[in-house]
Amino acid sequence: XSSLPAASVSLPADSEGGEEEDLQCVCLKTTSGIHPRHISSLEVIGAGLHCPSPQLIATLKTGRKICLDQQNPLYKKIIKRLLKN
């Protein structure tokens, strides 16, 4: 059994008359070359009005936050497992 990093899933709340700046994807660039052992926590932001696809944000053990490419098979598996919970 592989040990997955701590994770949280946040589904966007539909904002009532929220500001237009909020209606965008957090992840404009993604990366797929990060090994899970370098990740201290993961956050999945579900798709919504602000962004058409789910976003996977990893916090590295160095404290840096990066967006992971959810098309990567390894990350897809992680997202699927997280969204099940």
Swiss-Prot record:
Question: Which InterPro entries does UniProt cross-reference here?
Answer: Chemokine_b/g/d, Chemokine_CXC, Chemokine_CXC_CS, Chemokine_IL8-like_dom, CXC_Chemokine_domain, Interleukin_8-like_sf
Residues bearing PTM Phosphoserine: 41
Any single Gene Ontology cellular-component annotation: extracellular space
Q: Does the keyword Transport apply?
A: no
> In terms of domain of life, where is this protein from?
Eukaryota
Q: Where in or outside the cell?
A: Secreted
Q: MF terms per GO, please?
A: chemokine activity; CXCR3 chemokine receptor binding; heparin binding
Q: List the disulfide bonds.
A: 25-51, 27-67
- Keywords annotated in UniProt: Chemotaxis, Cytokine, Disulfide bond, Heparin-binding, Phosphoprotein, Secreted
Enumerate the residues binding heparin. Answer: 76-82
Q: Which CDD domains match?
A: Chemokine_CXC
Give one GO biological process term.
cytokine-mediated signaling pathway
- Transferase is among the record's keywords: no
The UniProt entry, under SMART domains, shows: SCY
- Quaternary context: Homotetramer. Interacts with TNFAIP6 (via Link domain). Interacts with CCR1. Interacts with CXCR3. Interacts with THBD; this interaction enhances generation of activated protein C.
Protein family (similarity comment): Belongs to the intercrine alpha (chemokine CxC) family.
Record's function text: Chemokine released during platelet aggregation that plays a role in different biological processes including hematopoiesis, cell proliferation, differentiation, and activation. Acts via different functional receptors including CCR1, CXCR3A or CXCR3B. Upon interaction with CXCR3A receptor, induces activated T-lymphocytes migration mediated via downstream Ras/extracellular signal-regulated kinase (ERK) signaling. Neutralizes the anticoagulant effect of heparin by binding more strongly to heparin than to the chondroitin-4-sulfate chains of the carrier molecule.
| Protein name (Swiss-Prot/TrEMBL) | Platelet factor 4
Organism of provenance: Ovis aries
Q: What gene is behind this protein?
A: PF4
